A protein has these predicted regions:
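Cap/lid and interdomain-hinge subdomains that line or gate substrate/regulatory clefts
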Residues: 3, 8-10, 38-40, 100-228, ...
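C-terminal catalytic subdomain
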Residues: 283-421
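Periplasmic-binding protein-like
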Residues: 65-74, 93-95, 256-261
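N-terminal basic/disordered segments at the start of proteins
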Residues: 1-36
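Short, acidic/small-residue loops that bind anionic groups at enzyme active sites
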Residues: 83-110, 117-123, 128, 280-293
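Extended hydrophobic packing segments that form well-structured cores
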Residues: 365-492
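Short, well-structured alpha-helical segments in soluble
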Residues: 53-65, 84, 242-252
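Long, internal scaffold/assembly segments composed of regular secondary structure
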Residues: 216, 221-307
Length: 492
């Protein structure tokens, strides 16, 4: 289902300083492997010097590992242990052994001290290593660190092997979706920019494709009878195949793709439908298709898909919740204020698995008003997937390169409330603690676009570590009242 997301094969390398018992490090390595219950490849080479380091890296490469745990079973050899990250092409986590599994004479490893030298040497060599919040622990503790590291590594590997394919340019008066490509290259992401006309030519070339009937049947099965426009299926299936073939034919040296596509105003009339439902289907398979050529929205979605190993979406931070609705359905039932809530909306790109059971393919009301005759039945503005979003824990986040070329990000955890919106599109009532202050002093103050990515679960801890590893210096979050923002007026 998620062929567009990396599979992490994790290797475990133990290191040992030659003045400490090597057997201590090896015993502790074996205990970690046992605690992981087969979830890691245990490298048999213990690293004491640079030649050992080269042998260990060759061994984990031969085993197919694409991420590593470098384990300081004792103080560790600071030069060879840190050079592992230079010679191994993948993310490395550095962790250290806690004492307590032996006496404090021959059984003391001093890895607590060795981790300091490890960090110092990584810095001197300008090498990146992931170090957990508290990197010292027992075998069971480190097994838990490893379980957190796997989705982090998945996202890092994905980003380093990602190509974002765009069909644009962005709609007029949509400068909020600006996307300086400098930040993409800093992150190691490739981008292929195409015109909407390129997409149309490819779409027309897929007319009569022999695979269309099978895709139509899959769409029927997904939606259920009465939940789709039968006369639209072939057009939408043709478009889905167009995108999938383009991804396969254009990913080039990269392994993974995401799209950022123009979807209005010309698209519906020229293609004959709105692309939202098709976009939602690709997103459910780990291939984000960001609306309105939002390149950093696509990147954000892809990172969230890697971390959560689940479908994600991209929504407008759209409208306030009416006070009357808050009073009737939220106040007293949930521990939120009115300004903690807002509605997240998009025309219809959220995967069906994240919507309420009454979801259906409908038409885009705003585009119908704009593009089709008043009073007419919707025609080419059909194709949106609409319903209230199902109640869920969520993480609202974004990684963005701003107009000055600086990478910034934000992360806020909250939930989608089980409250009917009474509105149209793919829409839900979101609640995030202290959203009002976050909205003013992060989203507005730092000039973020109106699109935010949504992961369906609480993934703030993992996203924070990924953004930090990628070198993002500004990682904002919804700060509690006890921690004012720098721009917050203390007299207000």
């Amino acid at each position: 289902m998620f062929e567009n997301i990396p599979n992490v094969k994790l290797g475990l390398i133990a290191v040992s300083r030659d003045c400490f018992p090597r057997t201590l490090s090896e015993m502790r390595r074996a205990n970690i492997a046992k605690a992981c219950e087969g979830g890691v490849y245990e490298c048999p080479v213990t690293v004491e010097n640079e030649n050992d380091m080269l042998k260990a890296v060759a061994d984990v490469n031969a085993a197919g590992c694409n991420a590593l745990v470098v384990f300081l079973g004792n103080f560790g050899p600071e030069t060879p242990e840190t050079l592992i990250t230079r010679y191994f092409d993948g993310p490395c986590m550095f962790v250290a052994a806690a004492e307590g599994d032996g006496d404090l004479i021959n059984g003391r490893g001093d890895a607590y001290c060795g981790m300091l030298n490890c960090s110092y040497n990584l810095g001197m060599r300008h090498l990146k290593g992931y170090i957990p919040e508290y990197p010292v622990g027992t075998a069971e503790d480190i097994a838990k660190m490893i379980s957190d590291f796997i989705p982090i590594a998945r996202a890092i590997i994905g980003v380093k092997n990602l190509k974002i394919i765009t069909f644009g340019p962005r709609p007029q008066d949509f400068f909020a979706c600006n996307a300086p490509i400098k930040g993409l290259y800093e992150l190691g992401v490739e981008v292929e920019e195409n015109s909407e006309l390129d997409l149309l030519v490819s779409y027309k070339a897929h007319a009569g494709d022999a695979r269309i009937p099978a895709v139509c049947e899959d769409m029927k099965k997904e939606m259920g009878e009465g939940k789709y426009y039968a006369d639209m299926l072939e057009r939408m299936a043709q478009f889905e195949l167009t995108l999938l073939d383009w991804a396969e034919g254009h990913k080039g040296a990269r392994k993974y793709v995401a799209f950022a596509d123009k979807c209005w105003p010309a698209f519906p009339e020229q293609f004959g439908f709105e692309p939202c439902y098709v976009n939602s289907r690709l997103a459910s398979r780990g291939i984000p298709v960001a609306c309105e050529v939002d390149i950093y929205g696509a990147l954000s979605e892809y990172i969230g898909a890697c971390i959560s190993h689940d479908a994600v979406t991209l929504l407008d931070i759209n409208n306030s919740v009416p006070a009357s609705l808050f009073e009737a359905e939220i106040k007293g039932k949930f521990d939120y204020t009115l300004t903690d809530t807002f509605m997240g909306f998009h025309c219809g790109n959220t995967p069906s698995c994240k919507l309420c059971a009454d979801r259906a393919v409908k038409y885009q009301l705003i585009q119908h008003r704009l593009l089709e005759p008043a009073g007419s039945e919707p025609d080419f503005t059909r194709g949106t997937l609409e319903a209230d979003l199902a109640a869920s824990q969520i993480t609202f986040y974004r990684l963005q390169c701003d107009s000055d070329g600086v990478l910034r990000s934000y992360i806020a955890e909250g939930e989608i409330l089980p409250v009917h919106t009474g509105s149209f599109g793919g829409i839900g009532i979101f609640a995030i603690p202290e959203m009002g202050r976050f909205y003013r002093h992060v989203l507005i103050q730092k000039r973020y676009p109106h699109h935010g990515a949504v992961a369906f679960g609480h993934y703030g801890k993992l996203l924070f570590e990924v953004f930090k590893f990628l070198g993002v210096g500004d990682i904002a979050y919804n700060q509690p009242k006890s921690l004012p923002y720098p721009t917050e007026n203390p007299f207000a």
